[in-house]
Amino acid sequence: MARLRHIAVVVKDLEGAAQFYEKVFDLKRVGEEHLEMGSGIYLSDGVINLALLKYKGESGSGLKDAANFVGAHHFGFQVDDVEATRARIEAAGGKFFFTLGKSKEEANFEVKFKDPDGVIFDISEKGWLGTSK
C-alpha cells in the first residue's frame, strides 16, 4: 500500500515560509538545496516531508511562469486542539479562510487558513477519511 509521505509547495518567500511552518507546527528542518533551477527547504514531522520550493524560472519546474507561481491547492495537518492551533497560526501571520464540515468531532471537519504567502492549508482534530493519527 502506498502512503503519502511528501508534498511540495512553491512559495514566494522561502525562508519566511519555512519559519512559519517550523513555528506553527513544530516541523523540523531536515534539508536545504540551492540548485540552478531554484532552491528548496525540506521540513518534516517525522512522517511526512514538506518541501518548500522557490523556482528561478520554468526550467525543471514544469510550470509556465514558474518564478511567479505559488502553491499546490492545499494540504492538511491533524492537530490535537483546533482552537489552540488557530491561535498559533494567527499569531504567526496566518489568516483564517473558512470552515468545512458540521462538527469538529467528525472526520473531514477542517478549518482552512492561508499562510503568509497565501497558500491554503487546513487543520483537523479527527483527520480525514482514510487517515489515522
Which residue ranges define each predicted feature?
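Helix-adjacent hinge/juxtasegments
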Residues: L53, D65-H73
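N-terminal beta-strand motif that seeds the catalytic metal site of vicinal oxygen chelate
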Residues: M1-G16, A72-F77, K126-K133
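Conserved beta-strand in the GNAT
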Residues: A51-L53, D122
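Core segments of cupin and vicinal oxygen chelate
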Residues: A2, A8-L50
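Mid-chain, well-packed structural core segment of small domains
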Residues: F75-I89
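Short, charged/polar surface micro-motifs in flexible loops or helix N-caps
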Residues: G46-L50, G57-S59, V82-A84
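Vicinal oxygen chelate
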Residues: Y42, R86-K133
